[in-house]
């Protein structure tokens, strides 16, 4: 009885320790980047709006380029790779959540046609596994396995993200067909400027909320500033600026409403593009091969017949 109670106590102690350790890791340590795909997953059922706009652009305001490479056509039930390219200058540093400077992270959302999904680990070729590395692919939701998100991951290592994709088999999945399908992709580098609740992150420009004169600037101990602006009617408005953005105003300066108080710290941005892929019918390829073979055979017989005819003509002329 005593031994059983001792085992239970040890298990409880172990569980409590793991819980506290996880809490410390998740909450206590400063984050180098916000987990931006989570924001979209929590707020939107589908990341692509009816207009074609990918919702990541709601938080990542700057526009940057992104590219995708996919095969022109694939056979059913085969594994192929889609490569998403998110280029940027790796020397750039962004403002982190704690106000310090650090490297940029990248993230991507890949919107595949219905039926296409991330390939199981046992179906991925070894050569492709070496390109993937330690990437983790997450379905956008349990209902949308054809929509995949990756990130945030270090941009210095992953300016190209390889997705191992398994194509569907229309013979088994009646919801898919041999057809040309669009593939949509969104990719960003760096943190966002807006949170889902509409508030600004510290990776954004801060503007004056009113017209007036800056009568005092106070630096906060942990970074950031408090600006007191005196309005024309004598009221004092307090502007709070978090750690990270750099001030471009000074005490005694007059400002107008919506005038920038800080530089724009953002060096990243979001981009989206699309590609096309054909789910090819093997029977069509076999028919095409058979057609080419028949043409070659017909051409061969035609040449042989022509030579035979020429020999007959030559024999008649000699006779």
UniProtKB/Swiss-Prot annotation:
Q: Which InterPro entries match?
A: Cyt-f_TM, Cyt_f, Cyt_f_lg_dom, Cyt_f_lg_dom_sf, Rudment_hybrid_motif
Q: What does this protein's record comment on cofactor binding?
A: Binds 1 heme group covalently.
Q: How does it sit in the membrane?
A: Single-pass membrane protein
PROSITE patterns hit by this protein: CYTF
Q: Binding positions for heme? A: 36, 56, 59-60
Gene Ontology cellular component?
A: chloroplast thylakoid membrane
Q: Which GO terms describe its molecular function?
A: electron transfer activity; heme binding; iron ion binding
Q: Where are the transmembrane segments?
A: 285-305
Signal sequence region? 1-35
Domain of life from the UniProt record: Eukaryota
Instruction: Give the UniProt subcellular location, in the record's own words.
Output: Plastid, Chloroplast thylakoid membrane
Q: Which cofactor does it need?
A: heme
What keyword terms does UniProt attach to this protein?
Answer: Chloroplast, Electron transport, Heme, Iron, Membrane, Metal-binding, Photosynthesis, Plastid, Signal, Thylakoid, Transmembrane, Transmembrane helix, Transport
Which residues, by range, are in coiled-coil regions?
none
Q: Which GO terms describe its biological process?
A: photosynthesis
**Which family does this protein fall into?**
Belongs to the cytochrome f family.
The job of this chain, per UniProt, is described as: Component of the cytochrome b6-f complex, which mediates electron transfer between photosystem II (PSII) and photosystem I (PSI), cyclic electron flow around PSI, and state transitions.
Subunit description:
The 4 large subunits of the cytochrome b6-f complex are cytochrome b6, subunit IV (17 kDa polypeptide, petD), cytochrome f and the Rieske protein, while the 4 small subunits are PetG, PetL, PetM and PetN. The complex functions as a dimer.
Designated name of the protein: Cytochrome f
Gene name of the encoded protein:
petA
């Amino acid at each position: 009885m005593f031994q059983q109670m001792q085992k239970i106590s040890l298990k409880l102690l172990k569980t409590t320790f793991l819980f506290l350790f996880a809490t410390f890791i998740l909450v206590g340590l400063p984050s180098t980047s916000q987990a931006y795909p989570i924001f979209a997953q929590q707020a939107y059922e589908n990341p692509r709006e009816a207009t074609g706009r990918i919702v990541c652009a709601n938080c990542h305001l700057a526009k940057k380029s992104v590219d995708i490479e996919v095969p022109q056509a694939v056979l059913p039930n085969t594994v192929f790779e889609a490569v998403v390219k998110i280029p940027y200058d790796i020397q750039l540093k962004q403002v982190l959540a704690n106000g310090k400077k650090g490297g940029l992270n990248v993230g991507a959302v890949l919107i595949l046609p219905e039926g296409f999904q991330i390939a199981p680990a046992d179906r991925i070729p070894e050569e492709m596994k070496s390109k993937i590395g330690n990437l983790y692919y997450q379905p956008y939701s349990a209902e949308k396995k054809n929509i995949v998100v990756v990130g945030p991951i270090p941009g210095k290592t992953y300016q190209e993200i390889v997705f191992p994709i398994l194509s569907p088999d229309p013979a088994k999945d009646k919801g898919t067909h041999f057809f040309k399908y669009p593939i949509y992709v969104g990719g960003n580098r760096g943190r966002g400027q807006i949170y889902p609740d509409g508030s600004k992150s510290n990776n954004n420009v801060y503007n004056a909320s009113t017209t007036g004169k800056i009568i005092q600037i106070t630096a906060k101990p942990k970074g950031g500033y408090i600006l007191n602006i005196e309005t024309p009617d004598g009221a004092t408005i307090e502007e709070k600026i978090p750690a990270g953005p750099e001030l471009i105003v000074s005490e005694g300066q007059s400002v107008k409403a919506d005038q920038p108080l800080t530089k724009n710290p953002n060096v990243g941005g979001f981009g989206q593009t699309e590609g096309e892929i054909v789910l090819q019918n093997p029977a069509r390829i076999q028919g095409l091969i058979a057609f080419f073979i028949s043409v070659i055979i017909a051409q061969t017989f035609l040449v042989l017949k022509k030579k035979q005819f020429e020999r007959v003509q030559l024999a008649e002329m000699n006779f």
